[in-house]
């Protein structure tokens, strides 16, 4: 009586693993190239960006698998392997916000704000109107916390809808979010003193490719990307990291030189590491609550 579900599951698994097209089967027209060269895959499932290239084997395949587990496995608040979550956080794994290296639907839409089950999949940036941070808070509002610890606050969103018309008379509707923060862990911040920006997760696609490119190639492509008629001027973003000027390649608006500078482990999950050894809530009451 269990044969049908098992067969169906196997069929679904194989359908996701192989869509029947291999890179060797593709004839590329002159003047064109595959987006990832020989690493291009042709899956149409949600796992298309969450797999290694077909030719990755041996030690490199093991390295990819270990990195993929590090990315997807849920963090706990223990001190052992796979631990380190909190005391405050926004998501409990990289994959929780970036499902299959893509985007996870944020609770901003499904629950109208902060998630009710220890997960939100969004970042709430808070600051003063002049850009300075508040003394009892960092740059991100951590709306989740481990057991026994109070989150920094909770986000609520309400939407207003407005109807407009195209020149031909066809109507369309725009949705405007109105954010508010409640249950502040310390002194409440007045709305008129607060600048709040809510961001949904970015896709984590092609970062390894960017790291492998020669910086001069990126600079040459940027120089060609000039379209003044559209108000577009291609230019690279240069950043200073540890006193060294580098080409920005990763992060929001290319603000980081490489993936080691990504703040996700520290800022989003509260996991300390060799790059960011301090707790994300250093100096706040949650440090003692979570110890």
Language-model-derived ranges and their functions:
Residues 1-2:
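Positively charged n-region of N-terminal signal peptides that target proteins for export
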Residues 13-38:
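Bacterial Sec-dependent N-terminal signal peptides
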């Amino acid at each position: 009586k269990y044969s049908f579900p098992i067969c169906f599951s196997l069929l679904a698994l194989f359908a996701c693993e192989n869509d029947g097209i291999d890179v060797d089967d593709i004839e590329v027209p002159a003047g064109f190239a595959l987006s990832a060269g020989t690493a291009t895959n042709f899956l149409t499932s949600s796992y298309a960006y969450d797999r290694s290239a077909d030719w990755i084997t041996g030690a490199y395949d093991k390295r990819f698998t270990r990195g993929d587990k590090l990315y997807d496995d849920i963090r706990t608040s223990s001190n052992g392997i796979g631990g380190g979550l909190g005391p405050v956080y926004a998501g409990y794994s990289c994959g929780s916000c970036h499902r299959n290296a893509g985007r996870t639907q944020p609770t901003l839409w499904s629950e109208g704000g902060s998630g009710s089950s220890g997960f939100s999949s969004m970042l709430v940036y808070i600051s003063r109107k002049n850009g300075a941070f508040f003394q009892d808070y960092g740059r991100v509002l951590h709306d989740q916390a481990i057991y026994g610890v109070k989150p920094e606050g909770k986000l609520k969103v309400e939407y207003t809808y407005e109807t407009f018309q195209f020149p031909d008379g066809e109507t369309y509707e725009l949705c405007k979010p109105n954010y508010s923060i409640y249950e502040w862990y310390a002194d409440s911040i007045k709305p008129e003193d607060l600048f709040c920006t809510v961001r949904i997760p970015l896709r984590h696609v092609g970062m390894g490719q960017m790291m492998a490119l020669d910086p001069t190639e990126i600079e040459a492509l940027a120089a060609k990307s000039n379209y003044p008629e559209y108000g577009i001027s291609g230019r690279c973003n240069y950043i200073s990291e540890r006193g060294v000027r580098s080409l920005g390649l990763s992060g929001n608006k290319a603000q980081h030189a490489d993936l080691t500078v990504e703040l996700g482990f520290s800022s989003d999950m509260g996991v300390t590491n060799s790059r960011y050894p301090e707790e994300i809530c250093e100096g706040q009451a949650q440090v003692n609550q979570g110890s």
